[in-house]
């Protein structure tokens, strides 16, 4: 996965760093596995902004991803690896032996032409999906379920994975990238290997416009606003805000705890590193 630094032919190209993927398919996605994706601009059904800094961006089609991997004991061949604008990971189009096609999150070691499958007796090979009960301790896995049959929820972004460190009773112990060790039921399924496109974090967009293409709008500092718009606003000349940093609605930020004390640590063996 070569890293390419753009030639500084203009101010907008000077700081661009791209991670090129030569194996990516250049055509359009499979039509039967896409659907319309409408934009909200961060507004709710009353037209009010509920999520700031959203809006614009290039049109997208949503790719329907198979997170359940419920084609049990059916062999599938990787037809192509594709770019997906809706996530950091790449996706793989799978041709199953019964004629069905599905998209999955593309594992790092899987390439075009490889054979993958799901099931309790599936080989321990990158891209295969098995219950945690049947996966050897020490294996790196991704796309992990939290409830059996619900579909993958953990370790789905580019380059991510978890390590199966132990089994205890009806649960497996998984070490997440954050350092957290978490219990997951043994009947939950996971895919062997790491998620591909692990160079995603090395890229540099190079200019503000590239962020606008992704549908993200600018973030304005409170001290640059008027008093009517933000608690830090106003004042003659440049000011520091004059108080502890707060949100536009007066809630303290930078370390202030806002989460309700109702969470349970029943399935968390060790908290993530701070």
From Swiss-Prot:
Any Pfam family the entry gives: Ribosomal_L2_C
Family: Belongs to the universal ribosomal protein uL2 family.
Alphabetical list of InterPro entries matching this protein: NA-bd_OB-fold, Rib_uL2_dom2, Ribosomal_uL2, Ribosomal_uL2_bac/org-type, Ribosomal_uL2_C, Ribosomal_uL2_CS, Ribosomal_uL2_dom3, Ribosomal_uL2_RNA-bd_dom
HAMAP family from the UniProt entry: Ribosomal_uL2_B
PANTHER family according to UniProt: LARGE RIBOSOMAL SUBUNIT PROTEIN UL2M, RIBOSOMAL PROTEIN L2
Entry superkingdom: Bacteria
GO biological process: cytoplasmic translation
Protein name as catalogued: Large ribosomal subunit protein uL2
Annotated region (Disordered), positions in chain: 222-257
Subunit-level organization: Part of the 50S ribosomal subunit. Forms a bridge to the 30S subunit in the 70S ribosome.
Species in which this protein is naturally found: Nitrosococcus oceani (strain ATCC 19707 / BCRC 17464 / JCM 30415 / NCIMB 11848 / C-107)
Function: One of the primary rRNA binding proteins. Required for association of the 30S and 50S subunits to form the 70S ribosome, for tRNA binding and peptide bond formation. It has been suggested to have peptidyltransferase activity; this is somewhat controversial. Makes several contacts with the 16S rRNA in the 70S ribosome.
Keywords in alphabetical order: Ribonucleoprotein, Ribosomal protein, RNA-binding, rRNA-binding
GO molecular function, one term: rRNA binding
GO cellular component: large ribosomal subunit
């Amino acid at each position: 996965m070569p890293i390419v630094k753009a030639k500084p032919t203009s101010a907008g190209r000077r700081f661009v760093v791209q991670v090129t993927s030569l194996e990516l398919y250049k055509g359009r996605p499979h039509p039967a596995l896409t659907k319309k994706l409408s934009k909200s601009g961060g507004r709710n059904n009353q037209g009010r902004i509920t999520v700031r800094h959203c809006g614009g961006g290039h049109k997208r089609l949503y790719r329907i991803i198979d997170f359940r991997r419920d084609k049990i004991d059916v062999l599938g061949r990787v037809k192509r690896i594709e770019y997906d604008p809706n996530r950091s990971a790449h996706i793989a189009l799978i041709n199953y032996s019964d004629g069905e096609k599905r998209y999955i999150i593309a594992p790092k070691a899987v390439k075009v032409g490889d054979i993958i499958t799901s099931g309790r007796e599936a080989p321990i090979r990158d891209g295969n999906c098995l219950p945690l009960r049947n996966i050897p301790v020490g294996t790196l896995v991704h796309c992990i379920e939290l409830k059996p049959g619900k579909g993958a929820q953990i370790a789905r972004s580019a380059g991510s994975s978890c390590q199966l460190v132990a089994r205890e009773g009806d649960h497996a112990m998984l070490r997440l990238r954050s350092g957290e060790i978490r219990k997951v039921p043994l009947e939950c399924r996971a895919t062997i290997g790491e998620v591909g496109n692990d160079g995603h974090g090395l890229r540099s967009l190079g200019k503000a416009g590239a962020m606008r293409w992704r549908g993200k709008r600018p973030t304005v500092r409170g001290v640059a606003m008027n008093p009517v718009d933000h608690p830090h606003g106003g004042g003659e000349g440049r000011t520091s805000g004059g108080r502890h940093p707060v949100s536009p609605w007066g809630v303290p930020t930078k370390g202030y705890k806002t989460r309700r004390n109702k969470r349970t640590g029943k399935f968390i063996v060790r908290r993530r590193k701070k």
